[in-house]
Amino acid sequence: MRAAAHALQQATDFLRGDVAVKGGITTLLKTAHLAEAFRMNFEVHHGGNSLNNVANLHVIMAIRNTEFFEVLLPDSAQKYGLVEDIAVGRDGLV
């Protein structure tokens, strides 16, 4: 796991990932907990589509060491698969 090597070598200030790249919710949670063990934030980047972003948001709500949810703009190309899509409000909150 490259994330562990980066954390051990203090080669980064935070770790990142998403459900599609890290191999699902369980692996994403494990990587977030690894970051927490090294007193780092784990930031979740855009999942590439609406369904992945729902899974990403579930992880974000389950961990303490995160500060933001990345949204790619313009977002129309990544919005599909949900009846009611995720919307970011004027206040920046989901």
Question: What residues fall within each predicted segment?
Answer:
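Shared catalytic-loop signature of beta/alpha-barrel
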Residues: 1-94
